[in-house]
């Protein structure tokens, strides 16, 4: 990842040639520097939300509703983004529904696929056999399916919960995409349904940013003739109130970052405070996790600048000094560093000290050590890539991935994310679980690493960069770039299968923790879907504005 010294130095004081990336600047100026929370509006939203929550809670636990109606209610609550208010009630209902589920011949494709998706999302391993009745004697999908747009859409979304060995869901995925794409814009779909289909094809429910997908669904649900006005009202109020909270938090983070003034000392680095907070909000959006969002954002910002230092500025000799300093984690190590690295190193130590003090007040600072160790590990792996780049070495794909699963930040992000959760959820055992290199964390890291390798490949190679996974695979297997991309995306899909399998019961740790790893995987899908949206933030600018600035009209 490092820039190397190119050419001979004229003398010992000459500045080495550096492969500067010339990253796009921050988009935001002082846009998020100030924000005053409207307390009156906040209280107004909050008072009505509490009333509506009790009404909806009564709906969830009320008896007499058919299973299909109950599963649909749970689906609507989740897609509207308000299910986090009713987690206990929903889990109790799903446990009963799964225990009593029968493959009723009266259930249509929409209902079966909905059951499958909801059960799988909550860890219940429903068999793919429930879809057998939608295949003919030759094993082909029945022709009547093509006319059931809602059923096809429901099945399409369900296929994203597949695990390894479920060939039927692979076939169903390809089939539903082909059918839905052929219907978009045609005479058989209303404009509203066509809009839903187009959005689903662009972004699935399971891999989407939860809060953004909730906002999209609210706009669709509002046009649904069968909508429940109580649910719709609660969803709008909840989104807008939580948006106010997030906007206030973002203002605090943005000001903190400006006051830290690190970018002025390392101007080669990406200035991405807003984007890092956006990322953290995907990991956990719920109001009680405000400390976690701040902690994760700060650590991500430091890692981002560290990444750019190894990737686009530091010489190999400078980077070795920095790696050693991080391993020591002691202020005295600063004396050995170049001036620009001193600023970064000082910020690293100070921010972790600040985070540790804040978490100690709540009795949950025991995770900080694990985060520091993960940071040290990443820096060691950055140095390995720096050496590869200096030597012009193209590693085997296996050797590359062994190192890349560290630089993908899966362990660091997961550890830092857990630090922001309640002590009774993120226990010492949870942090020890991360040390076992669990399949889910590795899969999450692989998704982020491989999709980034594909999306940023051309730009990175143009300026000079260590061989990526794409390059390593091409060389080792003697294939074209396009062929290698196909293979890497197969690996990404298998990583998603592993994540889906890891959330099936019985799980290694609490689902409240696993959902955070899933969310960290989701943000990779959103940010790197078509291009590197972190390096080029204009790609996700509309998402940021939608999430933090634009309220839903009441």
Swiss-Prot record:
> How many cofactors are bound and how?
Binds 3 Mg(2+) ions per subunit.
Query: What cofactor does this chain's UniProt record say it requires?
Result: Mg(2+)
Q: Does the keyword Lyase apply?
A: yes
Annotated EC: 4.2.3.204
Q: Pfam families of this UniProt entry?
A: Terpene_synth, Terpene_synth_C
Q: What function is annotated for this protein?
A: Terpene synthase that catalyzes the biosynthesis of the terpene valerianol, which is a volatile compound of floral scent.
Which PANTHER family does the protein's record reference? Answer: ALPHA-HUMULENE_(-)-(E)-BETA-CARYOPHYLLENE SYNTHASE, OS04G0344100 PROTEIN-RELATED
What name has this protein been given in UniProt? Valerianol synthase TPS1E
Q: Which gene encodes it?
A: TPS1E
